[in-house]
Amino acid sequence: MKQCENFSIPHTRRHWLHTAGCGFGAVAFHALSQQIAAAADPTLSTQTLHHTPKAKRVIFLFMHGGVSQVDSFDPKPMLKQYDGKDLPFKGLDTLDIALKDKLKENKRNGRVLDTTWNFQQHGESGAWISDLWPHLTKHADDLCFIKSMHTRGTSHGQAVAMIHTGNDNLLRPSLGSWVSYGLGTENENLPGFVSITPPAGHGGARNYGSAFLPAHHQATTLGHSGSKTADATIRFLKNPTVELSEQQRQLQMLQQLNRKHFTQNQHPQIDAVIRSYEMAFRMQNLAPDLIDISNESMATRELYGLDQEPTSDFAHRCLLARRFCEAGVRYLQVSTPYVWDQHGGLVKGHTKNALSVDQPISGLLTDLKQRGLLEDTLVVWGTEFGRTPVAQGTDGRDHNPAGFTVWLSGAGIKAGYSHGSTDDFGYYAQENKVHMHDLHATILHLLGIDHEKLTYRYAGRDFRLTDVYGEVVKQVLA
């Protein structure tokens, strides 16, 4: 006769942590309510604000792969003049050695490639936007373009790590984790950092991880890259093998064991674990409602392009970002799959990709503005690097970390403004250069945080997001 295994009731705290953790334990540990943690550690509370914030939260729209700036937001008439010709290039001596070598290689192996798309000025600000982004043009006067971005790393792994963690080769906390650590959450029932379909490659979890910061500051993830957002769930929030009522009874027993253990040891981490499970229980009631978009109006669904292709999936991500933002999550990371890396087939690839995200992003900006959320929400659109003005092969562009564009919108941002510039061919940042560290410093500044003062002691030194670099780009502030 087959023996009945695991029949005995688990009676140790460790055993309960294991069995109950299959349902909500993992979420509980890293989605700990920062308001509760602040009671034991004041560095996690809003008392760390160094000045009056303009933004309460951030939505970071990450275009994974490298969007071409000269085909999107940075028109260069010289590309047409020199199309198919060698690049008459000067100015490489101003760049660091790695970038200089990379650009010299591009110059030797490729000829100038003109853009396929037409650029026009839009809005009262006269912002230049190509017809690759027709829906975004409606928001020209709400956007602030930084056209002089540059970063470290010529490979995706390095550059993706830079945009998300501020370091291209070492394990460091992600930007969202630093925001969670510095500000906590506006809603004690939700984590401070949520990543919707996070990037899987080029560093994967490090791009939304907490590294040496307390583990509860890493992102709570919703789905994964390549999965349909409509099917996305928060992992470990519910144990599919037991009913919710049974799970609640497990939690009650676990809490009794934890409290007994706490009275014997009086360790603050045990108390934090107790409270984290309570927060996980609250998430069980709130998170499913946030993920369920069935109550959204038809007008909202049409605004985002939710019920049509090819916009449906990214529209779902942007709509979830608005819902989590509205509910009090501090930092939303919304990523595309790794689709923007057109070393060949640039026109086909960029057209397909822009069609899938242009309307949803436009819808998000409109929705935030209509609800009054854009006044205290910072929206960041970014990509790990740009692309070269010379061709790779016949119809592609190579990586270009020396000069590219990001844009900002919302809280505290000078709307309808373009900052900085690249050279005549869009190859490298030339005027009012902005490094990735500067962008990070500016984001923290808008949240009320001095990037030089937000530090964490680890391995004998004080670490910060911007390391020993970074300056706030004051020109882009309202």
Feature locations, PLM:
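Ligand-binding pockets and gating/stacking loops
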Residues: 2-478
